[in-house]
C-alpha cells in the first residue's frame, strides 16, 4: 500500500495517526442474521473465525440497523438515512417493473421512495475510488437492478460478482435472481455450487488480480442466512442433534446466560415476551422438522464464518491484515417471515435448488436468534434493529483488543468511520455536478477511544410504518400493528416490556414532535399523493398498494379494511386505516398471516358492527378450491382475535359449486346473519355468488 500525506477535513476529528498510511477496508454484511446467533455474541453456532476477529477487535453492544435489507444497504453505503438515498421502502426486484406504466412498483414518485440509489448520494465505493482505492464487491446488491446505471460498477465498484436481486437460490441462482459478473448476466452455475463460497472466492480473485500497491475496499455482502433454507449437508449435520435435543427454550436460555457473562447485555435485562409455544408443546414431528430447519439456518451462518476466515487468512498470508479495517454486521434482525411459528414453505423444499424465496425457519427460531429482544426483521423494536458489529484494525486499536463498546451507533456512521480511517474527502457534488446530501452519521472512532459519552443526541427509524426515535435513555416507538406511540427506558428495559407512555407524556410528546420534524425534513413522509381522495398504504410493499376497501363507522370515526398484497403471490394481508372525513386516511394497523390456514395470505375483508364489536370476515388466499371464509373480532377495530374454528365457512361441493368461498360480505337482517360470497361452478370456469345464513 502506498503512503500519502492527507489533508484533514472537518469530518476527521481523530488524530492524524489514524490515516497516515491508508488501510485496506473490508466490510462483511450478512443478511437476516439475529443479534445472538454468532459465538462472540452468545450464540451456540460455531463461528471460530468471527470469535477470533472479535477477540482482536471491538464489539459494539448497541449498534443499530434500519430493520430491513435494502434500506439498510442504502444507509450503510451512503452515510445517509435510507429515505435520502431513495430507498425508504424497498428496492427493485424481479417482476416489480411494470411495462404498462414504465415504472417500478417501488418508485412512488417521491424522492424518498424511488426504489434505487438516487444521484444525490454517493457510495463508499465512489468516494474511495476518487481517493486512490481499488473497489471490489461480491454478494447481494439490492440497491437497484432495472437499468445498468443502477448496478455496482456504475456506483463506484471496479469489479462485481453476485446477485442484483433481494433473494436467490444458494445452489442454483438463475433468471432474474441469477448471477452477474461486472455488467454481464451469467447462466445458472453448474452443481456443486454454493453462493457463500462463490462470493468469497470471486472477492479474493479480484483482490489477488490487483497489479499495483494501492489500498482496496472490499464489500462482501453475503445473502446468508436469508431464506431459502439451503446449506451444505456436512454443515447441517453439525447442528441437527443439538437443536432436536434442546429446542428453542433451552437454546434461548443458554444464549441469554452467555450474553450476560460476556457483558453483551446488562444484568438487569430480562426476556422479551415469548410469542410461541414452548418446545415441549410441539408434536414429535414438529420437533423433528423445526429442529432441522434451525440446523440448516445455523449451517448457513457457520459457512459465512468459514468464508470470513478465508479472507482473514488471505490478508495474513499477504501481510495486509494489520493495516486492514474490518467491519462485520447484519442488515436487520432475524427474519420471522411469513410470521408462522414453524416457518413457511414445504419441508421437502429445503435444499431444493429451484427454490429462491422459501422455505424459512419461522417466528419461534427468529425470536430465539434475537435473544433476548422483542420482535424481528422489519419492526423497530430492538429485535428488528439490533445488530452485532465487530470492528477490527490490528494496527490502530492498541490495547483495546477484545473490548466492548456500549455507546450506541447506527448505519449512517459507517461511511464517516471509513472516511476518517482512510483520509478520503467526502464530495459536495458528484454525478456530473449533482449536489450531494451532507452526511448524517458520525465516525465511530470517538466511541471506540472512549473520548465521548455518546455519538448522537437523537437516532431515528422508519420502515413501512414502523417508527422509532431514541434520545438518551428514552426510546419511543409506534409499531405497524399499533395505534399509539409507546415509550421505554431502553437502558433499564431493553426488551421493551414496560411501556412508560402514560407516566411520562411530556417526554413522549417531545420525541413524537422530534420524529415528525425529522420525517418531514428527510422525505420519510411521502408527498406524492395527487389528491386527498387518493389513498395508498405505504406500510407494506404491494401490487397494488391497497384494494378491496370496506368502510364502516365506528366510535365517532371511520375505519377502512383493505387488501395489501406484497411482492410475489403469497403473504397477502389486511390493512387498517382511519379517517374522520372519509377522504383523509392514515394507516393504523394490519392483520398478517397468523395460522396455517392463512399461510399464503388473507384478503378481501368485509366488516360488520354488532354490540360495539367489529366482526371481520375475510378469505384465505392461494389455495384454489380450498379457499374459505374466516372470522375475527375486535373491540377497538385494530387488535383482532381469530375465531378458534377458522375457517368458519366453505360451501359443500356439489352439483352447483366447487366448494370454494371468497370475497365475503355479511349483513344482519331479519334476526339473521347473511353471508354473501363468490364461488365457482364445479368445472371451475364460471364465477357465481352464493349466500349462507346463520
Model-derived regions, located:
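Beta-rich carbohydrate-recognition and catalytic domains
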Residues: 36-38, 98, 529-663, 667-694
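Short, intrinsically disordered low-complexity segments
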Residues: 1-2, 72, 139, 373, ...
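Sec-dependent signal peptide hydrophobic core
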Residues: 5-10
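Formylglycine-dependent sulfatase
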Residues: 2-3, 18-485, 490-520, 524-532
Amino acid at each position: 500500500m502506498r503512503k500519502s500525506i492527507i489533508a484533514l477535513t472537518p469530518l476527521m476529528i481523530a488524530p492524524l495517526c489514524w490515516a497516515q498510511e491508508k488501510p485496506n477496508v473490508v466490510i462483511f454484511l450478512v443478511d437476516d442474521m439475529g443479534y445472538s446467533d454468532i459465538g462472540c455474541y452468545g450464540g451456540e453456532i460455531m463461528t471460530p473465525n468471527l470469535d477470533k476477529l472479535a477477540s482482536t477487535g471491538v464489539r459494539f453492544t448497541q449498534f443499530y440497523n434500519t430493520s430491513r435489507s435494502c434500506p439498510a444497504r442504502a444507509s450503510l453505503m451512503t452515510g445517509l438515512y435510507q429515505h435520502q438515498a431513495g430507498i425508504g421502502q424497498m428496492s427493485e426486484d424481479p417482476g416489480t417493473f411494470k411495462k404498462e406504466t414504465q415504472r417500478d412498483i417501488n418508485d412512488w414518485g417521491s424522492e424518498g421512495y424511488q426504489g434505487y440509489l438516487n444521484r444525490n448520494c454517493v457510495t463508499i465505493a465512489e468516494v474511495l475510488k476518487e481517493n486512490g482505492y481499488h473497489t471490489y464487491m461480491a454478494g447481494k446488491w439490492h440497491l437497484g437492478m432495472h437499468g445498468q446505471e443502477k448496478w455496482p460498477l456504475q456506483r463506484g465498484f471496479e469489479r462485481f460478482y453476485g446477485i442484483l436481486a433481494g433473494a436467490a437460490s444458494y445452489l442454483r441462482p438463475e433468471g432474474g435472481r441469477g448471477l452477474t459478473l461486472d455488467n454481464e448476466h451469467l447462466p445458472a452455475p453448474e452443481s456443486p455450487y454454493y453462493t457463500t463460497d462463490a462470493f468469497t472466492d470471486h472477492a479474493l480473485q479480484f483482490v489477488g488480480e490487483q497489479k499495483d500497491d494501492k489500498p482496496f475496499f472490499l464489500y462482501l455482502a453475503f445473502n446468508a442466512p436469508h431464506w431459502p433454507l439451503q446449506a451444505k449437508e456436512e454443515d447441517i449435520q453439525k447442528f441437527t442433534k443439538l437443536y432436536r435435543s434442546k429446542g428453542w427454550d433451552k437454546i434461548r436460555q443458554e444464549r441469554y446466560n452467555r450474553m450476560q457473562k460476556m457483558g453483551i447485555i446488562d444484568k438487569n435485562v430480562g426476556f422479551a415476551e415469548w410469542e410461541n409455544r414452548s418446545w415441549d408443546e410441539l408434536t414429535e414431528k414438529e420437533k423433528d422438522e423445526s429442529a432441522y430447519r434451525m440446523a440448516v439456518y445455523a449451517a448457513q451462518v457457520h459457512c459465512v464464518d468459514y468464508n470470513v476466515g478465508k479472507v482473514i487468512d488471505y490478508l495474513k498470508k499477504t501481510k495486509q491484515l494489520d493495516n486492514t479495517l474490518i467491519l462485520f454486521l447484519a442488515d436487520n434482525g432475524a427474519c420471522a417471515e411469513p410470521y408462522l411459528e414453524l416457518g413457511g414453505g414445504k419441508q421437502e423444499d429445503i435444499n431444493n435448488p429451484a427454490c429462491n424465496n422459501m422455505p424459512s425457519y419461522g417466528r419461534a427460531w427468529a425470536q430465539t436468534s434475537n435473544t433476548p429482544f422483542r420482535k424481528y426483521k422489519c419492526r423497530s423494536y430492538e429485535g428488528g434493529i439490533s445488530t452485532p458489529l465487530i470492528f477490527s484494525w490490528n494496527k490502530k486499536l492498541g490495547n483495546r483488543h477484545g473490548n466492548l463498546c456500549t455507546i450506541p451507533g447506527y448505519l449512517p456512521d459507517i461511511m464517516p468511520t471509513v472516511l476518517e480511517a482512510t483520509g478520503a474527502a467526502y464530495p459536495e457534488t458528484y454525478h456530473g455536478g449533482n449536489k450531494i446530501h451532507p452526511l448524517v452519521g458520525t465516525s465511530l472512532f470517538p466511541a471506540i477511544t472512549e473520548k465521548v459519552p455518546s455519538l448522537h443526541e437523537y437516532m431515528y427509524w422508519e420502515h413501512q410504518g414502523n417508527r422509532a426515535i431514541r434520545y438518551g435513555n428514552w426510546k419511543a416507538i409506534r409499531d405497524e400493528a399499533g395505534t399509539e406511540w409507546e415509550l421505554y427506558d431502553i437502558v433499564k428495559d431493553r426488551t421493551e416490556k414496560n411501556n412508560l407512555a402514560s407516566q411520562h407524556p411530556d417526554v413522549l410528546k417531545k420525541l413524537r414532535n422530534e420524529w415528525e420534524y425529522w420525517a418531514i425534513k428527510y422525505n420519510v413522509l411521502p408527498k406524492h399523493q395527487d389528491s386527498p381522495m387518493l389513498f395508498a398504504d405505504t406500510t407494506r410493499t404491494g401490487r397494488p398498494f391497497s384494494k378491496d376497501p370496506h368502510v364502516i363507522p365506528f366510535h365517532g370515526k371511520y375505519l377502512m379494511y383493505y387488501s395489501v398484497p406484497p411482492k410475489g403471490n403469497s403473504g397477502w394481508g389486511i390493512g387498517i386505516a382511519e379517517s374522520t372525513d372519509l377522504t383523509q386516511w392514515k394507516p393504523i394497523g394490519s392483520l398478517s398471516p397468523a395460522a396455517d390456514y392463512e399461510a399464503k395470505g388473507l384478503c378481501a375483508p368485509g366488516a360488520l358492527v354488532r354490540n360495539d364489536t367489529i366482526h371481520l370476515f375475510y378469505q384465505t388466499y392461494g389455495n384454489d378450491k380450498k379457499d374459505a371464509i374466516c372470522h375475527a373480532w375486535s373491540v377497538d377495530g385494530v387488535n383482532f382475535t381469530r375465531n378458534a374454528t377458522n375457517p368458519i365457512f366453505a360451501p359443500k361441493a356439489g352439483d352447483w359449486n366447487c366448494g370454494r368461498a371468497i370475497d365475503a360480505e355479511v349483513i344482519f337482517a331479519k334476526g339473521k346473519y347473511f353471508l354473501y360470497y363468490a364461488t365457482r361452478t364445479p368445472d371451475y370456469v364460471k364465477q357465481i355468488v352464493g349466500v349462507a345464513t346463520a
